[in-house]
């Protein structure tokens, strides 16, 4: 499979006309969107995408053999051909999407009448040799073709040294796409995309190693390396206390500022807090993927944490800031680069039920990370949950590969595996014992 990764290199120069180029490109996309909306009836009759694109270009770009119907070339003279085609493609996509959503609204498939947005946030693509020329091998710079208000000229753009060192160290020799301009936090970046061909693990189920992960709020993640017979080979607690302290400090400053001045002029502080939280999620995801790779895991198993609805209660801010889905998405991308698969299991009762099968646990009121089993044993609640997550994966994979008669026989001997929301680690051990006995017989 193909895995696409990207990285943004910051542009250091402040005296090159990037803003002029960006404004001109967005104005061109706006103009093309208005044009294609007026002639969409004609363009929609063309089924082939390439022919539709060619016809759309002929409408706005004149040559010796083609007289353009609209005066786009006069409004945007000397625009590079590749940049013009990128703008045409963006405008065509916007108009096509609008009419598709409009038909769905008329048929009742979606609610709310869609609108065609002309104020776009399109970003130009700098195609190689036409609008972008890389610098020397060790040079932290590139040449960009930009619009200075009168003409299109080449400008030297200095790039941040640390960003270029990262690209040279980790992505040298990889297939890269044309860089795209990006604006973040009042700064401009060149975002490079790289495509890798990876082969995911094809190890048979019985020979697999899995890394079961319990994502938490107090402890960022707890990982367990587990075999199909239930043997736990290694465990790891992933936590970043300094990052969480920094985030807590920023949230406290926001709270005090809002008490004194209200909710106005607080956007920049919240933006900083969100960036800290995103960085915490990125570090957690990287640690999980690297730990699984170090232990030669074939699959990373998460809980399915698609929480919906309004969150209430005094802990709602913690739950809102918990980037569970972002961690899983980032980790999945990193795992695929290592050739590791990602799977998800039902999250119900993984923390509530003890891994030894003794039933519901009682949380320690002083330390929420600890719990007490009904047998009186004190244990880490997140570690117990990671065992249950791994067990649910193995129970599912073992049962679904069996013939119907053998599956029914095992479910009759181990009734707990029928209900996947209450399966625990102890049920996996019993299932493996019964499965081994049936094979021996």
Protein language model features and the residues they cover:
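Nucleic-acid substrate recognition interfaces
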Residues: 1-441
